[in-house]
């Protein structure tokens, strides 16, 4: 059970980080 929670936490963190990087690159291209 604990491993499943940690796995989903890691997956959510990775998706959030990717989204932040994607938005950051788009803002750099807009400037």
Swiss-Prot record:
<dbReference type="GO" id="GO:0015979">
    <property type="term" value="P:photosynthesis"/>
</dbReference>
<keyword id="KW-0472">Membrane</keyword>
<keyword id="KW-0249">Electron transport</keyword>
<protein>
    <recommendedName>
        <fullName>Cytochrome b6-f complex subunit 6</fullName>
    </recommendedName>
</protein>
<keyword id="KW-0793">Thylakoid</keyword>
<dbReference type="GO" id="GO:0009512">
    <property type="term" value="C:cytochrome b6f complex"/>
</dbReference>
<keyword id="KW-0602">Photosynthesis</keyword>
<keyword id="KW-0813">Transport</keyword>
<comment type="similarity">
    <text>Belongs to the PetL family.</text>
</comment>
<dbReference type="GO" id="GO:0045158">
    <property type="term" value="F:electron transporter, transferring electrons within cytochrome b6/f complex of photosystem II activity"/>
</dbReference>
<keyword id="KW-1133">Transmembrane helix</keyword>
<dbReference type="InterPro" id="IPR007802">
    <property type="entry name" value="Cyt_b6/f_cplx_su6"/>
</dbReference>
<comment type="function">
    <text>Component of the cytochrome b6-f complex, which mediates electron transfer between photosystem II (PSII) and photosystem I (PSI), cyclic electron flow around PSI, and state transitions. PetL is important for photoautotrophic growth as well as for electron transfer efficiency and stability of the cytochrome b6-f complex.</text>
</comment>
<keyword id="KW-0150">Chloroplast</keyword>
<keyword id="KW-0812">Transmembrane</keyword>
<dbReference type="GO" id="GO:0009535">
    <property type="term" value="C:chloroplast thylakoid membrane"/>
</dbReference>
<feature type="transmembrane region" description="Helical">
    <location>
        <begin position="4"/>
        <end position="24"/>
    </location>
</feature>
<dbReference type="Pfam" id="PF05115">
    <property type="entry name" value="PetL"/>
</dbReference>
<keyword id="KW-0934">Plastid</keyword>
<comment type="subunit">
    <text>The 4 large subunits of the cytochrome b6-f complex are cytochrome b6, subunit IV (17 kDa polypeptide, PetD), cytochrome f and the Rieske protein, while the 4 small subunits are PetG, PetL, PetM and PetN. The complex functions as a dimer.</text>
</comment>
């Amino acid at each position: 059970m604990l491993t499943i929670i940690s796995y989903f936490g890691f997956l959510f963190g990775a998706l959030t980080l990717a989204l932040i990087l994607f938005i950051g690159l788009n803002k750099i291209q807009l400037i």
